[in-house]
Amino acid sequence: FPSPAISQENFRWKMVTTWPKNFPGLGTGAQRVADSITAMSDGRLTVKLYAAGELVPAFEAFDAVREGKAEMSHDASYYWVAKHKAFPFFCTVPGGLTVQEHNAWVYYGGGQELWDQLCGDFGLRAFLAGGSGIQMGGWFQKEILSADDIRGIKMRIPGFGAEVINRMGGTAVNLPGGEI
């Protein structure tokens, strides 16, 4: 049998993120993804990581990929709730699924198909590349004993959690994790 014709061309892709390069867990995870892609391709596809603010600001990562400024982004889909209300389902949700449950839903429960449909509307393709676990609640200067205690509180929380805090009378701030 003849050998298949395989292109010997090398590719260089840019990966933008919504966090600092060495941000524990998320930033280091993004670097691991970039390094793994480069290694699995024997260096034919080199992925250079750009931390939030290096190529584009954190909250411009989605549009940077759509506009061709970068080939990929490592981010948290709840940041894109203003683009479509369904994006937070593909990320951590306060009181939501565990990492194992979320992975099972995406890989075996139809989640990836829904995500493909959602991202296809934007000309993008998404896949899981790490996880931070269930979105934490908050750390507050005063004790929270009831739902009424949320009134007047200002906290950093994106996605569905932000909607809940706002409806309870608090003020949610959508801020990249690296800017806290």
Language-model features: locations:
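An acidic- and aromatic-residue-enriched active-site/binding cleft used to recognize and process polar
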Residues: 18, 52, 160, 177-178
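Extracytoplasmic "Venus flytrap"
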Residues: 14-31, 52-56
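Short, low-complexity disordered leader/linker segments with a strong preference
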Residues: 1-12
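A structural preference for short, hydrophobic beta-strand core positions in alpha/beta folds
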Residues: 47-51, 174
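Mature N-terminal segment immediately following signal peptide/propeptide cleavage
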Residues: 12-14, 46
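Short, hydrophobic alpha-helical packing/hinge segments within bilobed ligand-binding/sensory domains
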Residues: 58-62, 180
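Contiguous mixed-secondary-structure segments that line small-molecule binding/active-site clefts
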Residues: 31-35, 66, 71, 76-177
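Short, polar/charged alpha-helical segment
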Residues: 23-48, 110, 163
